[in-house]
Amino acid sequence: MTKKKRENLGVAQEIDGLEEKLSRCRKDLEAVTSQLYRAELSPEDRRSLEKEKHTLMNKASKYEKELKLLRHENRKNTLLSVAIFTVFALLYAYWTM
């Protein structure tokens, strides 16, 4: 996803979108794998399916890595929000005493 698009989406929305893409990719990978083992294929068809399988595996791996980074970023954002809330709560408690 381009940086400009990322700026317009929240981290949680990006995570949801990537999880959906990863799910579709895994379903496609299952379909290709079942085609490889289900039918008698010509060597050319087999090579084509194996190439597609390899491409899908690489794509899934890329999505998983990006999801890992986004989840880490989401955790950092959550911790920052909790820290800011705690500071405001302490300031409020101090101010009202």
Swiss-Prot record:
Principal place of residence: membrane
Membrane-topology annotation of the record: Single-pass membrane protein
Record-level GO cellular component terms: membrane
Keyword Transmembrane found: yes
Coiled-coil region list: 2-78
A Pfam family of this chain: CCDC-167
Protein name: Coiled-coil domain-containing protein 167
Gene name, Swiss-Prot/TrEMBL: Ccdc167
